[in-house]
Amino acid sequence: GTSRAAMMFLSNWLNEYGELGIMSVSSEYLSGRSVYINKESRINHALNHGGAAVVRLYLEEEHYVLMTGVKNGNILLFDPYYWDKPYEQKDILMDWNHPRSYNRVVPFKYFNQENEEIYSLGPVEEREAVLIFNEKTKTVPEEVIEYFI
């Protein structure tokens, strides 16, 4: 598995490459209470505005996935673990039609749990995520106007 220090290293490494102009990329390291899923979270904001998120969660053990989008109360993610049968949880779906974007569709409700159940982010104090943005396509809150009725 990947060490926790590696998450911060990944974020710093991506930012260095972006600052040097090697890649058009930036990142942000999140931990603890900043790592959760809902409409107002920084993770969801990144996913809704062209970013992605590497998060540590649980799938039989600590595990890392790449979140790539949000759709209808679900997180679209790429899970590198090969899984060839349906999950016991019928609302967690495998998707083989988007191999360059995601291969799992997981409802929000699984992530914010503080236990070590499937796709849980686990105890708040142990949570980590790295938000990743393509600087050419990234939008910032000031550039996005949202209307609430």
Predicted regions and their residues:
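Mixed-charge, low-complexity intrinsically disordered regions
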Residues: 60, 74, 120-149
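Conserved active-site-adjacent core of cysteine acyl-enzyme catalytic domains
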Residues: 1-119, 123
